[in-house]
Amino acid sequence: MIFGSRRRIRGRRGRSGPMTRGLSALSRAVAVAWRRSLQLRVVALTLGLSLAVILALGFVLTSQVTNRVLDIKVRAAIDQIERARTTVSGIVNGEETRSLDSSLQLARNTLTSKTDPASGAGLAGAFDAVLMVPGDGPRAASTAGPVDQVPNALRGFVKAGQAAYQYATVQTEGFSGPALIIGTPTLSRVANLELYLIFPLASEQATITLVRGTMATGGLVLLVLLAGIALLVSRQVVVPVRSASRIAERFAEGHLSERMPVRGEDDMARLAVSFNDMAESLSRQIAQLEEFGNLQRRFTSDVSHELRTPLTTVRMAADLIYDHSADLDPTLRRSTELMVSELDRFETLLNDLLEISRHDAGVAELSVEAVDLRTTVNNALGNVGHLAEEAGIELLVDLPAEQVIAEVDARRVERILRNLIANAIDHAEHKPVRIRMAADEDTVAVTVRDYGVGLRPGEEKLVFSRFWRSDPSRVRRSGGTGLGLAISVEDARLHQGRLEAWGEPGEGACFRLTLPMVRGHKVTTSPLPMKPIPQPVLQPVAQPNPQPMPPEYKERQRPREHAEWSG
């Protein structure tokens, strides 16, 4: 028996599961529709408020009608019982030869016979009569009619000499249901004679039920009409708003000629006119900005190309002088070194301007080949390693033991890494810089982590802006132009990859480059976290299969050979 009951309970739960899920899905759908549909909210609120008003009004009107009907019934009953008391007094005082019970029964029969319509029924309608003389000592009480239907509270008032009435539910031979019972003491030769009239409220109840039904039907019809009116009225407002939303979306997509139709002179028409004026102004400004941007890019490209030829000539002359600087006096030798250094910086600026103009014009192209990215990282380290040695900064390198083959433009990826490492050295505050690489089936990631000044909130986006610097007064050992990270993020996007930054003041910063292993694939996740371990390991990370460090990594080179790649 126990196991059987468990199976039944489990079956009931199994059947309730789909119902619960269905109700949950329905509630979510209703919640979504409520949040997204202004028309639904307007109609629902209109129906809710209208329903509250109709219920309140219906309650008040029903109460008024009920009280009015019952008041008429009570006044008619009072008139009826006054006439009945006179009739009873006449019958009881008429013949002394009749017994008390006979007199009471005769009086009751006389009263009830008057309720026949043919004999002139009272205004209060049909009723039943109860006559009673309470017992006194050894004498028993004398009654006529259904005395047990008279409430004790009402009998107490009548016994005290007061006329009173009360609503009660009675059950007699000819009627069962709510009734009005009115009682009064009667003056006659029989002391303490009490008269009660029972008036059925069937017709009044039917009238009240009819009124309530009529009001409910009218309220329902009115509610439906109000819903339709609210739907139509809200549609007059929602349709133009939806049209404006669709046109705004198309405008945001680049369809600058989209405009709202103007109909009439009402508020919606003024909204359409204002929207069209705004769209016209925005389209003009966008066109002007696009034209200005094109001119700016063309100017940058033209200037960069025009300066290339004289710069090459000056470079050749400077190199010739530099090669014979040993024969010059110290002052001229130092001037030659400064001239070569500034030419390196100027050439780097031209190269960066040319590269950023290619990205702006959309003509930058990838030269994709399958390469081992570990070699690319080592090449980048070899080109900027001398900056770390000069600053006394330790580079901690953690590369996979196996090859990491990816389809990338090795030149652009190496440039990204050089910019990131040089930027980390500039901001490391003589603390170690960690370079890590990891790969999975789809993506490869390289992080460059420093433990220096870090980034303030919001600067992780600004750091990729052109010519932006967190602290303009900081001395940059890499001699960057301010375009390195801007070019790097464009190179990463060209690979359909991501270049992201994270930092906290005083905790350092981390730049993460994530690239797809296969050209054309999109990056969705990264094998390396954005937030590295906050405390650096001061010893170099031991590689499972250490690779020999390129000789140029320790060799101090001329600054101009690396200035092109500094950020």
UniProtKB/Swiss-Prot annotation:
The keyword RNA-binding does not apply. Pfam families: HAMP, HATPase_c, HisKA. Its EC number is 2.7.13.3. Residues 302-519 form the Histidine kinase domain. This is Sensor histidine kinase MtrB. Signal peptide: none annotated. Autophosphorylates in the presence of Mg(2+) and/or Ca(2+), but only Mg(2+) ions promote phosphotransfer to MtrA. Residues 552-567 have a biased composition (Basic and acidic residues). Keywords: ATP-binding, Cell membrane, Kinase, Membrane, Nucleotide-binding, Phosphoprotein, Transferase, Transmembrane, Transmembrane helix, Two-component regulatory system. The C-terminal domain (residues 234-567) autophosphorylates. Disruption phenotype: Not essential for growth in liquid culture. Member of the two-component regulatory system MtrA/MtrB. Probably functions as a membrane-associated protein kinase that phosphorylates MtrA in response to environmental signals. Autophosphorylates and transfers phosphate to MtrA in vitro. Overexpression of MtrA alone decreases bacterial virulence in mouse infection; co-expression of MtrA and MtrB restores normal bacterial growth, suggesting that bacterial growth in macrophages requires an optimal ratio of MtrB to MtrA. Probably plays a role in cell division. It is an enzyme of class 2 (transferase). Residues 529-551 have a biased composition (Pro residues). Residues 1-15 have a biased composition (Basic residues). Interacts with MrtA. Interacts with LpqB, probably extracytoplasmically via MtrB's sensor domain. CDD domains: HAMP, HATPase, HisKA. One of its GO terms (molecular function) is ATP binding. The modification Phosphohistidine is found at residue 305. The chain crosses the membrane at residues 42-62, 213-233. Residues 1-20, 529-567 are annotated as: Disordered. Its cofactor is Mg(2+); Ca(2+). Ca(2+) ions inhibit the phosphotransfer from MtrB to MtrA. It catalyses: ATP + protein L-histidine = ADP + protein N-phospho-L-histidine.
